[in-house]
Amino acid sequence: MKLPKEGDFITIQSYKHDGRLHRTWRDTMVLKTTENAVIGVNDHTLVTEADGRRWVTREPAIVYFHKKYWFNIIAMIRDNGISYYCNLASPYVLDQEALKYIDYDLDVKVFADGEKKLLDVDEYEIHKKEMHYSPDIDYILKEHVKILVDWINNGKGPFSQSYVNIWYKRYLELRNR
C-alpha cells in the first residue's frame, strides 16, 4: 500500500484484542511517514467511541506510531506545557481504510511537570483474563512499559521538547498554506 504523504488526512482506528472496534479518530493530519513510523497531528479532531458517543479533541496533539514498538504516544500541547498520553498497544498496520492497532488497556500519563502515572492496571488484568491475552503478549507489554519509561526519563523522540516544537511548527505551516 502507498504510504500517506505529508499533509494527507487519515483515519485512526483502535481495536480491542477480541477484534471489537474501540475508538476512531477522523482526519488526523500526516506530518511524516517512514517505512516504520507515522507522525501526525490531531487538532479539534472528531473522536467516536465504540458506544457511538462522539467528542472533539481540545488541543493540538502530536501523535507517534511505530511498527516495532508496542506503544503509541500522544503529545498534547497545552497552555501549561506538554502532557503525554501513551497507550500500550500493538504495533500499527496501515491499510486503505485506516491506521489500525490493538489497544491493550495500560496507559502511561506524563503530566507537564514530569510526573508519571501508570493507568488502567485493573482494566488490563480483567481484559487479560476475559480476552485471553497470551503469556507472550503479557511479557511483551510489560517489557514495553519499561522501554517507554526509559524514553520518558531520557527525553527520547516525542518526549523531547524540540521534537514537539519541530512537528508542531510543521503542522502550522501545512495548516496555513
From Swiss-Prot:
Q: Where does Mg(2+) 2 bind?
A: D105, D107, D120, E123
Q: Which GO terms describe its molecular function?
A: magnesium ion binding; nucleoside diphosphate phosphatase activity; ribonucleoside triphosphate phosphatase activity
Q: Which residues bind Mg(2+) 1?
A: N87, D103, D107
What top-tier enzyme class does this entry carry?
A: hydrolase
Keyword flag Nucleotide-binding: no
- Please name the catalytic residues of this protein: R23 (proton donor)
Gene3D superfamilies, alphabetized: FomD-like (2.40.380.10)
Where in the chain are disulfide-linked cysteines found? none
**Which SUPFAM superfamilies does the entry link to?**
FomD-like
Please list the reactions this protein catalyses: a ribonucleoside 5'-triphosphate + H2O = a ribonucleoside 5'-diphosphate + phosphate + H(+); a ribonucleoside 5'-diphosphate + H2O = a ribonucleoside 5'-phosphate + phosphate + H(+)
Q: Which UniProt keywords apply?
A: Hydrolase, Magnesium, Metal-binding
Write the Enzyme Commission number(s) for this entry: 3.6.1.15, 3.6.1.6
Q: Required cofactors, per record?
A: Mg(2+)
Name the family: Belongs to the Ntdp family.
PANTHER family tied to this protein: PTHR39159, UPF0374 PROTEIN YGAC (PTHR39159:SF1)
Q: What does this protein do?
A: Has nucleoside phosphatase activity towards nucleoside triphosphates and nucleoside diphosphates.
- The protein, known as: Nucleoside triphosphate/diphosphate phosphatase
List the top taxonomic levels of the source.
Answer: Bacteria, Bacillati, Bacillota, Bacilli, Lactobacillales
